[in-house]
């Protein structure tokens, strides 16, 4: 049982009974052994009265379903690698403010600075998720760590006012999605404080599962900032080998004894823990609208290349010919989603170029490495999935030589995300590469200009390094 914090609110005996009664009796997916969840409940800013209710509900849900065991804490030492590694998932429970920054009391017994300690804690959380840990966010977890850009992208967005605290309509965006199966209808109504989000929130990066129903909700409220009517309520994503689930419901205490929402949160937690399989490709990727075929097994009219260097083989794949060289799109692209499949031969060394200059691709463009490095532990900045010489992949998602891989490259301004076989392996802001020949971690790179200064518009292309490689189902969706 987790301790109940009176200072943040109190879970009364009556509320405890309501929470217990609302919990699902079993897991969505049975597990051989309960997972271990760390429930992080430190708030630096506004203290939600529902913090102990979220912790209590998470613990009781694990007990009733047998799917996990929960431990609540506000001790920042628990986020250190040696402690966090004891858990399978991390629940960010209605936190607010810069909780990743150590307080004076956290520095007792330490000889380093707050800045150095925070750097260790940041790296620990990111590495935990990239290595396969689950991240679960309740409500105001998005009202946290505004000074830590990578956290904003990891959790999916930042809070930008709550225009509604009343009954509102909810749209279940994908009723047939595995996480949506708990809902009996495509729309329902609920009362809670409802957030709107700002950057880095984007459907280019997230699979949005629930949104505000603007047709049945009062849209004349103050503080409505979004003009696109995209008011997300819940989403999922991947990060390396890890998974992220966020649900914005949970300001009001009674959310944690709403049976339908608790079933949904159970499934979201099991998804984040890796026990429930669900497609997390971003909503903009799976939305078929706006795509243009660059190669679909037929003609190569969209491309320019040396005659005989590339051709369509008998299986309808784009294949490398003798002395092929580079192959480039005729059009240049700035912001886009590039979706393709590739197959590498043994010892293959190729690459997917974007925002590149065909006349100087090595220094005038970006490359995602295509290489036969499947199974390699701790891949580096020259292995499959690397942003070549600039950023190692978060995880090795490459399939063995001879098998088809699916790669999605998403570029929007300075943000570059690469998804390989369903796993986000690059999630970078190239504005952080502000020094020529140097990466943000202090390591060297080949570039004579800072990556942030490279052109934001250029051609798409594939590289020939003399070993067989095949591409198919290549399409692009221009973005604003």
Q: Whereabouts are the PLM-identified features?
A:
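Extracellular ligand-binding/catalytic regions of CAZymes and related secreted enzymes
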Residues: 2-32, 52, 63-65, 74, ...
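Catalytic beta-strand/loop cores that center a nucleophilic Ser/Cys/Thr
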Residues: 14-22, 157-240
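Short beta-strand segments enriched in small/hydrophobic residues
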Residues: 34-45
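Short alpha-beta junction capping motif
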Residues: 37, 84-145, 241
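Solvent-exposed loop/turn segments at secondary-structure junctions
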Residues: 43-46, 76-78, 95-99, 135, ...
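Glycine- and acidic-residue-enriched helix-capping/strand-helix junction motifs
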Residues: 44-56
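A short, well-structured beta->alpha microelement
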Residues: 66-80
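Carbohydrate-interacting regions of secretory-pathway proteins
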Residues: 151-153, 157-166, 170-172, 188-189, ...
């Amino acid at each position: 049982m987790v301790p109940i914090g009176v200072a943040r609110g109190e879970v009364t005996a009556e509320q405890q009974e309501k929470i217990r009664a609302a919990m699902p009796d079993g897991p969505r997916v049975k597990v051989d052994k309960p997972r271990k969840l760390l429930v992080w409940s430190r708030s630096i800013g506004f203290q939600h009265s529902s913090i102990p209710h979220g912790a209590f509900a998470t613990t009781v849900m694990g007990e009733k379903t047998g799917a996990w065991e929960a431990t609540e804490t506000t001790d920042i030492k628990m986020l250190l690698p040696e402690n966090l590694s004891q858990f399978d998932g991390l629940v960010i429970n209605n936190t607010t403010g810069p909780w990743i920054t150590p307080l004076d009391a956290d520095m007792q017994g330490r000889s380093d600075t707050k800045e150095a300690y925070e750097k260790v804690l940041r790296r620990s959380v990111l590495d935990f998720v990239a290595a396969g840990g689950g991240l679960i966010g309740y409500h105001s977890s998005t009202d946290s760590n505004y000074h830590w850009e990578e956290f904003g992208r990891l959790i999916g967005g930042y809070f930008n006012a709550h225009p509604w605290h009343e009954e509102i309509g909810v749209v279940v965006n994908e009723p047939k999605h595995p996480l949506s199966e708990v809902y009996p209808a495509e729309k329902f109504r609920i009362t809670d404080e409802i957030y709107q989000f700002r950057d880095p929130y984007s459907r280019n990066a997230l699979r949005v599962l629930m949104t505000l129903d603007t047709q049945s909700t009062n849209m004349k409220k103050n503080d409505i900032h979004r003009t696109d009517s995209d008011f997300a309520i819940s989403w999922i994503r991947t990060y390396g080998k890890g998974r992220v689930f966020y649900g914005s419901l949970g300001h009001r205490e009674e959310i944690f004894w709403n049976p339908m929402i608790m079933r949904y949160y159970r499934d979201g937690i099991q998804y984040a823990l890796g026990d429930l399989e669900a497609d997390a490709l971003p909503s903009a990727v799976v939305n078929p609208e706006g795509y243009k075929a660059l190669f679909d097994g037929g003609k190569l009219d969209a491309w320019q290349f040396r005659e005989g260097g590339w051709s369509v083989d008998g299986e309808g794949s784009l294949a490398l010919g003798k002395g092929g060289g580079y192959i480039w799109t005729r059009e240049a692209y700035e912001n886009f989603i590039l979706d393709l499949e590739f197959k590498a031969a043994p010892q293959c060394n190729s690459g997917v170029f974007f925002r590149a200059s065909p006349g100087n691709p090595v220094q005038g463009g970006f490359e995602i490495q295509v290489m036969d490095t499947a199974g390699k532990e701790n891949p580096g900045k020259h292995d499959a999935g690397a942003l070549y010489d600039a950023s190692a992949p978060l995880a090795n998602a490459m399939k063995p030589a001879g098998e088809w891989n699916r790669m999605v490259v998403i570029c929007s301004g300075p943000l570059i995300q690469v998804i390989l076989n369903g796993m986000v392996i690059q999630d970078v802001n190239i504005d952080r590469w502000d020094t020529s020949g140097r990466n943000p971690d202090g390591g060297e790179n080949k570039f004579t200009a800072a990556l942030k200064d490279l052109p934001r518009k250029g051609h798409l292309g594939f590289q020939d390094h003399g070993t067989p490689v095949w591409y198919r189902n290549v399409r692009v969706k221009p973005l604003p």
